Amino acid sequence: MKSFLNKNKNSKKIIILDDNDFSKYQQRYDLQNQNIEIVSSPLQNIRSQQINDGVQMSGSIQSDLSSSDNFTSSGGFGGGGNSSSNTSNRNSDNSTQRPLMVDIGLEYKYRLALEQNPNDFKALVKWGSLIYKNIKNQMGGKHVDVCLMDWNEELIPIPQNNNNHHNHNHHNNHTSGNFTGNINSNTTLSNSFFETLNSFNLREPLFDVCGKYQSSLQLSGGSNLLNIPFSTLLNYNLNEQLNILVNNLNNSSPSSSSSSIKTKNTTSTTTTTTTTKNLNDISNNINNSRVLRSVSLPPAPPPPPTEDPNSPWSDPILWMKWGDCLFLLCTYLELPMYRATCEKYFKCIQILFKQQEKQHQQQQQQQQNQQDKEKFEKQNNYNIKLLAIVLRKWGITLSRYSRRMKSQFLMSEWTSDENIQVEELWKVLHSQSIQSLLISNKISPSLVTQYHLATAYHRHAITLNQFGCQSKEEIYGLITNSCKIYYETLLESLSDTFLQQLQLQQQQQPWHDIEYYNNNEIFNDQFKSKSLENWGRALDVQLSTKLNDEEETIEKEEEDLNSVDEYLTTFSKSVLKGVTPSLEGVVSLCLNSKQALQYKAINSVSVLCRSSEIVKSPIYNELMDQMTKVESFVSKRDDAESLLSQQKTLKSMPPKLQAYVRMSGLGEEEIMRNFEIAWNSIYFLTKDTIPNQPIPPNYYRSNKKNKLKQRQLNDSNNQDEKEEPEEIKPPLLPSIHRTNQLNNNNNNNNNINNNNINNNNINNNKNGNSGGETPSPSSSFVITPFTSNSQSKFNTQRQFLSNSTLFNLSSSGIFTNNNNNNNGGSTITTTTTNNISPTKTNGWTLTLPSKAPTRRATVSLININDLINQQQQNQINSVSTLSQNNIILNNNNNLDNKPISKYIPNSIIRTTVNPPLLSRCDETIFSSGTPLPLFRDKIKLGTGAFGNVFYAIRKSDSSPVAIKVLMERTKKDSPIIPELYIHSACNHSNIVTYIESYLCKGHVWIILEYCDGGTVRDLLQATCTPGNPNNLQLFEETLIAYIITELLEGLVYLRSKGIIHRDLKSRNILLTRKGKVKIADFGLATTCSLGRGRTRMCGTMGRIAPEVIRREPYDTQSDIYSLGCLIIEMAEGTVPYGKDSSLKALFYTAIHQYKLPNPKKYTKEFVDFLYLCLNPDPFKRPTPEMLLHHTFLSGADRGKSILLGRFKNQDTRKNLLLDNFVAF
């Protein structure tokens, strides 16, 4: 025989259990391995609180189950307010979990009571609630909301987590000191519940609870309460009930009218209390005609008789428990009980609205003192919170029921009397679910409710798409709503103020609601991870949806691109915040069929993989594995898909073009292996001579046709709108491309003469840290992902970036990196503009994604606050050293410690410069007046692609000048061309000096310095006659070394300015008779100071870099390759592949590295220097600063003597000019 103690309210007795009964309880509660002995210790060791056995409904239920129910009965989420006292409940919460022996005794007690009185329905209710309590304990604790464990899918593996906080010291987590730890904890199901669900061990207890509740309802005479026709559920108008609630609050006293219903304030991130005015806004904002649709339903039946207020079934908590049990049977055990579940939650909602109305009537009838008013306000707040919870449960259940109904899993539930078409009915259920979730989130804002609202839209869109909805616009509207809500939810949960906001909300919670809030209302990492996963699936549906209207399709493409931007940015921020999301969404984007979206996703994930912040993250290895698989799959897929299209394209070319390709000497097999390069080269060479040929898909960076249509659409829309004043937008400046860390260890090793580089950055940084002057806009970097021409509806993220404190940049500068072909190196710092708040530091790290350059730069947000502070301190400490040179050294690209060449000292490393912004000039750059009478003795020197060059004498000072006369060839009737503002910004001894410019009779006159030594090409030609071009006088290595040294000095200057020449050749290198070498002709020059690689294919045949031909982003490193071609021209008399056809030369330049035909006739230093310049990989190609330290250039002084000797006693150039005199 076994015995145990039980303490009732009025007596103390020992209940004796039979051996058979005890063994049955052991098996039921899994106590086989526990030794149960007679307890002789004091009674408080068994249970510290009393177990009251009152006769009132709610009090009796709460008395036996006070330590195990979800909600407390006094103001907390408990039974309708008819409880005993707050003190006993508080003591119950502070106590540890009561021993299992007490539950066994209670169950035995209820069994005896039912044997004595089979009609004791209250004992049935208590017994069912006891079993429900034990089910909740197995699921993770008494405060776990079963509906929130539904991850809004049909059937998924239940997350596992050892969640034991409900067993010991759960009250300690109520304090704010432990709150931060609770935020990141995943409140999920325990391992035991996971195992019991898989083995269906919970199926019998769940049915047992539902059976006892059903029997109790029948015994109490309330069976008619369940006769709720389905038409009542569908036609139930929540707006009407909400209006009644608003009217009651309007007519109540001022103290009670200001109910603490939480709402989101648009101007603040904190949680505030709202008045009845907010409830009026809620009822007015919800459009009932949109939510409820017309369906042919039978009239609603007469209402059931009024329930007994003393009946257990007047308690909304009891209906909620019943609904929770049915919800578990529906979702996790796949039983068709959704309709019954909806009925239970619906009944709970009805009772809550009636209680609210009844309390309002009692308040109006009675004269209340201050204590009664506080009690009424407390009860009113409790009802509103409980109403929000039940509405959320009902909305989740209706949404799942809607999909199941459409899937025809629940056809057995329909009766012939109702005669409702499923095709319309499931849409009404969805509308009711949206309405319920919207109202729940309005009266009690919660990110968890917002997440379930997004998944309700998502689920309905998937159902429409799965079962062949005719209206693609409807699917697209639903799925974009879902994606937008996902984005807003995650954006708020990932903000820096989120933890502070949660702490404030926790402090505002009553003591009896804190445990429920911590377990169910905190948007923890588990919710964030699942939100990203569901958002990725929704985004996949959005991208795959095709609209019929052409204008809407254009708008959809822009919106899809912005949605992908938002998703990738949020994904990166989540990983950096420590969340471990699913990779399904990003992998799907990386495999997207649209190339722009695919590149954007691969770039962003590649940047994330290279971030040092996630190396120790658990997702890092999986992310790297997935990216490896994606790259392999994309490569194979692209090869397979492009093979047939390449062959078709080649055969569809015009006959002249096919003949041109055959005459080039390239075989079809070679072309097919590198078809994109071949096609780009063919089009580049023949676009002006062979018309009507197809354009390579990647030749131009944008779809002009779509942009034109979009512009026409915007113009038509703007005709009916009033003109608004233009917004002052911050300058757009994307990334400079390389990610590196600051290294000041080798600053003293750089002896490069770079005094012309602006060195204001460090001073600005120092001033920014000390509250000095505001930095100038020319040195600012403001990052915005979209252009200013975007439509207003797509500017949400740009506005957020400029307004939100989350993205405020550091006042002392942001770190930019250069990962394009831009010279290697180190991190550079710049300062922010006046529009950026200096109160927070959030490091923007901007990179290209991988070593293999892609078409576009990628903007990535990486949190490097600690690194920024450390690097800023290092900079301040080394101001004296860095003030002489603005180049910050770094050996990050030489991690393997292997020198780039044995002829370059190991101390010489790659550098990254900070190119200042070049100011765009206007018409004021032109001098006034006409230039014709200002010059005399005008002689034509030569003709170029865009104009002529003349020699003249300036009358004012009799100095010789060169006049470059260009045809006006600019857009939008503006004479300003890039050559003007680029060349006018240059001031260096190795660059032809710009003097002034004029605008005369439709021509642009550019007055330049005259170089009397001619060009390098002229020096190569021994006789200087056009009729004998092959008679060349090749240069000695020392002469080549001198010319290259002078050119490298000029290239260092251009690189410091961020200028790419793009046409460096022998005819554009001018000489003076004093031995100076100067770079001329900036007609094709551009700037990379905007921080992105250029992609335009231009230049002169035989001097174009491989990355330019491959249509990859390039920068100043392309000029180093052109310098190598110039070396070959001076040494060999011809450029690389000069004896081949133009197409073959371009093709081979892009895919092969050039080799000298006879390298043995040159010194090893010369060959090494040449191959460094001609390296096809721009990342391995040295910078001009590094090349200046090459051993080959040590003989440059002797080369200058050779050059001066060639000019001595030579009047050939002057005679040639006089013979070719051409008057103006």
Curated annotation (Swiss-Prot):
From the UniProt entry, list the residue stretches annotated as the region Disordered: 57-98, 252-284, 693-784, 815-836
Q: Does the keyword Plastid apply?
A: no
Chemical reaction(s) catalysed? L-seryl-[protein] + ATP = O-phospho-L-seryl-[protein] + ADP + H(+); L-threonyl-[protein] + ATP = O-phospho-L-threonyl-[protein] + ADP + H(+)
Required cofactor names:
Mg(2+)
Record's signal peptide: none
Domain of life of the native organism: Eukaryota
Q: Where does ATP bind?
A: 941-949, 964
Q: Which GO terms describe its molecular function?
A: ATP binding; metal ion binding; protein serine kinase activity; protein serine/threonine kinase activity
Q: Which GO terms describe its biological process?
A: intracellular signal transduction
Task: Name the GO cellular-component terms.
Answer: cytoplasm
Keywords annotated in UniProt: ATP-binding, Coiled coil, Kinase, Magnesium, Metal-binding, Nucleotide-binding, Serine/threonine-protein kinase, Transferase
Q: Where is the composition biased (Low complexity)?
A: 58-74, 83-95, 743-768
The chain positions of domain Protein kinase read: 935-1193
Q: Name one Pfam family in it.
A: Pkinase
The active-site annotation reads: 1063 (proton acceptor)
Q: Where is the composition biased (Polar residues)?
A: 772-784
Which family does the record assign? Answer: Belongs to the protein kinase superfamily. Ser/Thr protein kinase family.
Q: What is this protein called?
A: Probable serine/threonine-protein kinase DDB_G0292350
**Higher taxonomy:** Eukaryota, Amoebozoa, Evosea, Eumycetozoa, Dictyostelia
